[in-house]
Amino acid sequence: MIDISGKDIVLREAIAEGFIKLKKDTIEKITKREIEKGDVIATAKVAGILAAKKTHELLPMCHPIPLEYINVEIEIENDGLKVVSTVRAHYRTGVEMEALTATSIALLTIWDMVKKYEKDEEGQYPLTEISKIRVVSKIKSYG
């Protein structure tokens, strides 16, 4: 890890988003809460929050950051689900990796919970796709 001891402790915020493309039937099942494994949206939100807290354990060069706020929102769209994660902390380094981790794990949780409905006759996933994972914004505030 790099030495951040000389940096000021300031408010850090990062927002990351990502998308999972799903079959229309699967989206309908999610909306109607008909997924056998449970409430997809609630489970993915919790998974994202837990993942953000574990980022430093997953990424070898990440600092353990005392996170003060994590929010994972999931929006149902026509062709899939969009995940938006917001993370905040007062610390010496940014929280982009925590926001990206929250988003990524929420998306993987969605895939895991709906994979039964996404497979074709041969057990493949011809439509399912995770994409557009990115940092939407990053704030470093001295105020």
Swiss-Prot record:
Domain of life, per lineage: Archaea
Keyword match Lyase: yes
Keyword Coiled coil: no
EC number: 4.6.1.17
Pathway this chain belongs to: Cofactor biosynthesis; molybdopterin biosynthesis
Active site: D112
Binding residue positions for substrate: M61, C62, H63, M97, E98
GO terms of molecular function: cyclic pyranopterin monophosphate synthase activity
Gene3D superfamilies: Molybdopterin cofactor biosynthesis C (MoaC) domain (3.30.70.640)
Annotated catalysed reactions: (8S)-3',8-cyclo-7,8-dihydroguanosine 5'-triphosphate = cyclic pyranopterin phosphate + diphosphate
Biological processes annotated in GO: Mo-molybdopterin cofactor biosynthetic process
Key words, A-Z: Lyase, Molybdenum cofactor biosynthesis
UniProt xrefs under NCBIfam families: moaC, PRK12343.1
HAMAP family, per database record: MoaC_A
Oligomer and partners: Homohexamer; trimer of dimers.
PANTHER family associated with the record: MOLYBDOPTERIN COFACTOR SYNTHESIS PROTEIN A
Function: Catalyzes the conversion of (8S)-3',8-cyclo-7,8-dihydroguanosine 5'-triphosphate to cyclic pyranopterin monophosphate (cPMP).
UniProt record similarity statement: Belongs to the MoaC family.
The protein, known as: Probable cyclic pyranopterin monophosphate synthase
Encoding gene, per UniProt annotation: moaC
